[in-house]
């Protein structure tokens, strides 16, 4: 159904339905190098591991063909990063916590005198409901027009606690009193000020529970051309304007972290457009039982609105290059294999701990069992190999000593049942 115009060339009239279930397993890891973590003159690396799994991702596709017309529809998860959990938090939160402690503690606390406990869970799903019509103009050409309604649901849950180690509070209090008395305060005034500082440290906790929703409409057009054994196709999806609105149930933070937490405040709207997409494809029937295809996708990310206009920092939109082969072993079995290379045009300013991408290539294999002329079963598996992305000078401490390395893995298994009524 990536070539909806081609549905008009289905050999038989009637209804066809495909029910698909996919299982996806991903990791999203960050290796953060910084002198902040210890403040002892050494650069250390903290590793933050994110895990995401979606055991059941359902989708349904259907088409009804009558004469030169074909009417199609689908419901599926068409985007979003799924659900990911970082049990040890994220580098951006630890760096913010250390900065907060330095501000409140007036630089008199080192990281070995306190502990930071944090965790973050994020989720992003885009559900798509698509309807359209295909029309066969003649024996060579068919066209398609339709639209997809996209509904976004997501959010973040997380916490961050700062705890002074045993005896540190008393030591800090004595240091603050000594410093303030040297500045001219009386003992009583200095003790009162030190008590306030200690209370500020005890209150230096972050907590977030925020849901996000939004929707947008994607108009779609397509064309399909058949010339003997050669099939050419093109599809264009227009940009969907979408704003994500916060429904924040809990947001707890000290005043010093107000700017840091501002994007998660209740009612805040953030642009999150779905980019326009162009798809071009060609397939050729080498033998009656053997077919090969190549395909190209372009996502116009640089012109899709994002938070703080970060899309402008991309070097270019996303390019995807695909190739595949399909072989009918006999009337009962069909096998296939495919390859995809993805280039996002990434930049340091585009990448962040809560949203990062890595260039990649994917390899997949599949098979079909034709139980009857009407009933068939598809199975497929693919994995993605990502190129690590290194972002330098993340916390403004110098490129050579301050960097984050983003890495990912992805494995997906799918099963589909197809029936022709």
Give the positions of each predicted feature.
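Outer-membrane beta-barrel porins/channels
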Residues: 12, 57-58, 63-421
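N-terminal, post-signal peptide beta-strand-biased segments of exported outer-membrane/organellar beta-barrel
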Residues: 1-80, 356, 382
């Amino acid at each position: 159904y990536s070539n909806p115009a081609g549905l008009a060339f289905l050999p038989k009239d009637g209804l066809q339905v495909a029910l698909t279930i996919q299982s996806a397993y991903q990791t999203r890891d960050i290796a953060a190098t910084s002198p902040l973590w210890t403040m002892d003159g050494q650069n250390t690396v903290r590793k933050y591991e994110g895990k995401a799994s979606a055991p059941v991702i359902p989708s349904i596709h259907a088409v009804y063909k009558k004469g030169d017309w074909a009417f199609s529809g689908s419901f599926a998860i068409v985007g979003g990063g799924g659900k990911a959990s970082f049990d040890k938090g994220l580098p951006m939160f630890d760096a913010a916590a250390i900065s907060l402690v330095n501000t409140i503690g007036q630089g008199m606390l080192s990281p070995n005198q306190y502990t930071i406990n944090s965790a973050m869970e994020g989720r992003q799903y885009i559900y798509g409901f698509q309807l359209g019509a295909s029309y066969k103009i003649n024996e060579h050409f068919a066209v398609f027009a339709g639209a997809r309604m996209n509904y976004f649901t997501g959010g973040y849950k997380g916490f961050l606690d700062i705890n002074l180690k045993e005896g540190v509070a008393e030591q800090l209090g004595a240091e603050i009193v000594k410093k303030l008395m040297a500045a001219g305060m009386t003992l009583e005034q200095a003790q009162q000020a030190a008590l306030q500082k200690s209370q500020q440290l005890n209150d230096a906790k972050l907590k977030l529970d925020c849901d996000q929703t939004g929707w947008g409409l994607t108009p779609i057009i397509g064309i399909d051309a058949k010339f003997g054994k050669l099939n050419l196709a093109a599809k264009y999806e227009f940009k969907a304007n979408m704003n994500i609105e916060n429904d924040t149930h809990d947001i707890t933070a000290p005043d010093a972290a107000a700017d840091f937490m501002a994007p998660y405040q209740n009612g805040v709207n953030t642009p999150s457009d779905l980019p326009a997409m162009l798809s071009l494809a060609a397939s050729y029937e080498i033998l009656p039982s053997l077919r090969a295809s190549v395909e190209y996708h372009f996502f116009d990310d640089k012109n899709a609105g994002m938070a703080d206009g970060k899309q402008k920092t991309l070097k270019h939109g996303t390019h995807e290059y695909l190739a595949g082969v399909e072989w009918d072993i006999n009337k009962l079995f069909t096998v296939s294999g495919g390859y995809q290379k993805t280039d996002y045009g990434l930049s340091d300013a585009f990448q962040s701990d809560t949203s990062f991408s890595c260039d990649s290539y994917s390899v997949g294999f599949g098979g079909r069992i034709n139980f009857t002329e009407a009933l068939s079963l598809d199975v497929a598996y693919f994995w993605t190999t990502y190129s690590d992305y290194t972002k330098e000078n993340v916390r403004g401490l110098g490129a050579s000593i301050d960097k984050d390395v983003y890495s990912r893995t992805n494995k997906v298994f799918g099963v589909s049942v197809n029936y022709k009524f």
